């Protein structure tokens, strides 16, 4: 069985992964058929690059992505795009849907960032209040 999975590279505590197509019986960092992308989890935000046409080709041939790679592919919007192609949508419809999807993703990221900032601010205020009450 052919899998689309991660191959670790980089140095100690600084991982960089290649997204590869490999036989499921080969070791994690062993023999592979093709490199179809890269993933850098240490960057903020994470960097994911995919050769979308090659991932689509291999998935069409029956390659199964692992759970982690599946979530990475989903994060790039490729699964959504492939689903629309499978449903028979036109290229123009797919392009407009992908623009909407990207806008929604950006809105989600912005919302997540603002929520984190609010939580940090509230936590600092609570710590300051507890410190001032402990002093007095």
UniProtKB/Swiss-Prot annotation:
GO BP, sorted A to Z:
translation
InterPro entries associated with the record: Ribosomal_bS16 (IPR000307), Ribosomal_bS16_CS (IPR020592), Ribosomal_bS16_dom_sf (IPR023803)
Q: Using the record for this protein, list the coiled-coil segments as residue ranges, or answer none.
A: none
Q: Where is this region: Disordered?
A: 114-136
Keywords in alphabetical order: Ribonucleoprotein, Ribosomal protein
Stretches of Basic residues bias are at 114-123
Q: Which domain of life is it from?
A: Bacteria
Q: What Gene Ontology molecular-function terms does this entry list? A: structural constituent of ribosome
Q: Sorted alphabetically, which Pfam families does this protein's record hold?
A: Ribosomal_S16
Q: Which GO terms describe its cellular component?
A: cytoplasm; small ribosomal subunit
Q: Which family does it belong to?
A: Belongs to the bacterial ribosomal protein bS16 family.
**HAMAP family for the chain:** Ribosomal_bS16
Which protein are we looking at?
Answer: Small ribosomal subunit protein bS16
- Its source organism is Chlorobium chlorochromatii (strain CaD3)
Q: Which gene encodes it?
A: rpsP
């Amino acid at each position: 069985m052919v899998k689309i999975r991660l191959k670790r590279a980089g140095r100690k505590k600084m991982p960089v992964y290649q997204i590869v197509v490999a036989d499921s019986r080969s070791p994690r960092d062993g023999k592979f058929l093709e490199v179809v992308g890269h993933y850098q989890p240490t960057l903020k935000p994470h960097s994911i690059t995919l050769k979308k046409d090659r991932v689509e080709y291999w998935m069409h041939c029956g390659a199964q992505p692992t759970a982690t790679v599946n979530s990475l592919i989903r994060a790039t919007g490729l699964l959504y795009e492939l689903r629309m192609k499978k449903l028979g949508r036109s290229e123009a419809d797919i392009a407009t849907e992908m623009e909407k999807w990207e806008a929604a993703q950006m809105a989600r990221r912005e919302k997540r960032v603002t929520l984190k900032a609010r939580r940090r601010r509230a936590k600092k205020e609570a710590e300051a209040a507890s410190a001032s009450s402990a002093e007095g």
